[in-house]
């Protein structure tokens, strides 16, 4: 028998729309999920891996279940029920995720377990239901085996196209405009509306519309009033971060401190509310060493803005002819610094909103490059993780070209001097020593060798020129900072590689630090 394959099977528009928008909602759910987990467990590679892995596994289970059920009962009413249940589950996720994440955080599991259980409990149910949609739609659209390939192909393409739209809408638009809970409520509303397309009975359509209106109204109310049980303080979402601004008291002196938090395990920036230009964090004071090693320092590059504590301090304490270029990835953080951390416009301050490595790459190939007197680096993707692309031999080459021969590169690293928590520091030290002839180490928190295995801020000062690493008569202003210098011979661990663009296992070494702590 010869089949006529010239006839193109017409797929009902309602099924095409269901396939398209269910794919978009799935990707929005995944992107928004990362923002909901971030305040509790960070945004490290481990968290992303767990989230993507669990959602993909759930979709796989949903595809299998949906196909099996559709073969036994290819009924549009059943697909409508699946969509309604998915909408309700997504709405429940929006309202109760903070309760669940807070409870999981209280169990003090390691990051692997916390990330997996968070994704499993919060996102697996809705992902399984959404995964059931595609095979169910394909079965409803399929009338005979002759056209099965074309039907499945077109519906798969529509689902993928929806996923693409959801990815760009979620990443470029929604997350920067709305809180995570609002996005999930809107997603739930869309899924509820899809059920209207597949239901045939009038009363079922009315029920679906009622659920849609309830969820849509919930999204609006959520935007106005916020979700219950959010972490304390002001909560903000940007394109790159979930930010918390809280206030506390510095136990050392009883003064009020405003704190910017981008990771649950560490603070990003601190500011005294009664004197914003004064530095709070001990490690930030070590950037002053640039003026010790090069007293005529005027032009400074800072990679990583955060709360702009260091630029604010330098603009207040240095002469009028100083100039500071700050490279900060997240424009939202800069706006928070303006709104909450006393960052003012200043003709001596220039801000670049881009990835620090792309800035270095562009400057590296600029024939009219104007070198800097000092470069400060304070960049983190989570509590202790420096972006790997800023820790490598290739990065050091670019930094060296941007820095004057007698200028100082000052890098903040969170690690230990020796032991299992030292991997990040040793890898960066090896990578940077290829380009800088002078490398000086300043344990900012505990300089005594007995604390060599303690996790702390380690300040690495690198210079292109060979200079005396010990100043015989330091200015009194710098004496305390210089007393932290590590003067014992330092030998990097031979088991730790010099980080390169091709291989920089920063996440693995940082995870060891967290697990040991």
Mark where each language-model region is.
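Short alpha-helix immediately C-terminal to the canonical SAM-binding loop
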Residues: 334-335
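Hydrophobic alpha-helical membrane-association signature
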Residues: 283, 391, 395, 428, ...
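SAM/dcSAM-binding transferase cores
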Residues: 241-244, 453-517
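Alpha-helical transmembrane segments of multi-pass membrane proteins
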Residues: 1-236, 247-256, 262-268, 295-298, ...
């Amino acid at each position: 028998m010869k089949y006529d394959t010239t006839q193109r099977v017409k797929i009902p528009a309602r099924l095409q729309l269901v396939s398209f928008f269910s794919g978009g909602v799935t990707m929005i759910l995944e992107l928004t999920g990362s923002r909901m987990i971030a305040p509790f467990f960070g945004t490290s590679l481990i968290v992303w891996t767990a989230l993507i892995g669990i959602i993909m596994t759930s979709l796989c289970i949903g595809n299998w279940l949906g196909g099996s059920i559709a073969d036994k009962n290819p009924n549009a009413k059943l697909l409508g029920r699946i969509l309604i249940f998915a909408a309700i589950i997504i709405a429940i996720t929006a309202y109760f995720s903070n309760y669940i994440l807070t409870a999981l955080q209280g169990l003090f599991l390691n990051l692997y377990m916390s990330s997996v259980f968070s994704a499993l409990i919060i996102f697996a149910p809705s992902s399984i239901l959404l995964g059931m949609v595609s095979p169910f739609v394909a079965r409803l659209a399929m009338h005979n085996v002759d056209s099965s390939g074309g039907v499945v192909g077109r519906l798969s393409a529509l689902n993928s196209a929806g996923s693409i739209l959801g990815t760009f809408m979620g990443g470029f638009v929604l997350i920067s405009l709305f809180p995570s809970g609002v996005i999930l409520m809107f997603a739930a509303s869309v899924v509820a509306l899809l059920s209207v397309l597949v239901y045939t009975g009038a009363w079922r359509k009315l029920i679906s519309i009622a659920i849609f209106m309830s969820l849509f109204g919930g999204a609006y109310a959520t935007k106005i009033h916020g979700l219950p049980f959010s972490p304390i303080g002001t909560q903000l979402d940007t394109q790159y971060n979930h930010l918390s601004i809280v206030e506390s008291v510095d136990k050392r002196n009883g003064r009020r401190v405003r704190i910017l938090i981008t990771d649950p395990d560490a603070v990003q920036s601190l500011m005294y509310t009664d004197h914003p230009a004064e530095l709070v964090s001990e490690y930030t004071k070590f950037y002053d060493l640039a003026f010790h090693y090069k007293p005529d320092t005027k032009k400074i590059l800072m990679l990583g803005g955060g709360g702009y504590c260091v630029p604010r301090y330098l603009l207040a304490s240095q002469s009028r002819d100083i100039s500071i270029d700050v490279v900060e990835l997240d424009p939202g953080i800069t706006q928070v610094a303006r709104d909450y951390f006393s960052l003012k416009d200043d003709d001596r301050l220039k801000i670049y909103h881009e990835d620090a490595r792309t800035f270095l790459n562009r400057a590296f190939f600029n024939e009219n490059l104007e070198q800097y007197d000092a470069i400060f680096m304070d960049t983190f993707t989570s509590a202790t993780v420096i972006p790997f692309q800023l820790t490598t031999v290739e990065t050091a080459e670019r930094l060296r070209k941007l820095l004057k021969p007698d200028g100082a590169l000052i890098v903040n690293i969170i690690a230990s001097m020796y032991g299992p928590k030292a991997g990040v520091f040793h890898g960066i030290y090896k990578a940077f020593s290829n380009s800088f002839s002078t490398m000086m180490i300043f344990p900012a928190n505990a300089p005594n060798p007995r604390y060599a295995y303690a996790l702390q801020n380690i300040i690495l000062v690198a210079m292109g020129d060979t200079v005396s690493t010990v100043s015989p008569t330091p200015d009194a202003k710098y004496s305390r900072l210089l007393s932290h210098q590590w003067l014992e011979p330092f030998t990097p661990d031979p088991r730790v590689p010099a980080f390169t663009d091709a291989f920089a296992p920063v996440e693995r070494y940082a995870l060891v630090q967290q697990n040991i702590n």
